[in-house]
Amino acid sequence: MFDMPNDQKIPRNNGNAEVDGGIGVDWGKTSRDYAEHRPGPPLSFYQRLAALEIGLPGQTVLDLGTGTGVIARQMARQGCKVWATDISDTQVKMAQTLATEENLDITFATASAETTKFADHRFDVITAHQCFLYFDLDKALPAILKMLKPNGVLVISHFSWLPLICDIAKASEQLILRHNPKWQAHSYSGRTYPNYPGMHPQFHYSGYFYYDVETPFTRESWRGRIRASRGVGASMNAAEIAAFDAAHAEMLETMTEGDFTVTHRIDAHIFSAGSVEN
């Protein structure tokens, strides 16, 4: 199970309207910072997936909630045939731009996880990175099940800083809360284990891993990473973001001497289509 901050559990129907007290979350507002400053998982993450025969050349992959296409682009680099969707048209346009710059052949579309439709049994792999909590599971999981091949897999993954271990992450979270007290995605304990809630009975666990990495940042890139978070860029207005960012810059001047690392935890929950008896 992915341990939701503040003991929240993943609801069966959780749209953006229900997040952070309904303040409104628009990831499209973060696209520039997201693309420039929000790092994806390191190559070791994809190597671990490859050891489980996920992300191999020639596999068909659908990346749901693709954002700026971090997972989709790496899968394409590895020789997969990739499709990717996101509910935000702004994010999709940024993802397409970044893929085009690398001459990567990825088919992008603007669609929610619940309304993404392809032919039955189309994909070897469907990925959902940092986005599964936003899905309406009653609608998304049956759709995912239909799109997966009989031996296909769903990969739910996260790449989260650890504020209880890293003082910089903790201080940044405290500052976010002073500017946006409704933000709920704070104080992640790092707790994770293979018992993901709310899954469809026609999925069963076929793999799971987690590990920690030290992710390098500069003051500027960490400011950008925090601006690209839900509690700042996706929910504050321009004036609020500017005020927060100025305070954040001042805080980092006193806490850091330049380059630093932030401890992150990576976890991946891998589900195969079909009940465990099959």
How should each PLM-predicted stretch be described?
Residues T116-V125:
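A short acidic, Gly/Pro-enriched loop at the edge of an enzyme's catalytic core
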Residues T60-L62, T68-T115:
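Class I SAM-dependent methyltransferase SAM/SAH-binding core
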Residues F2-L56:
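Conserved class I S-adenosyl-L-methionine
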Residues P194-N278:
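Conserved Class I S-adenosyl-L-methionine
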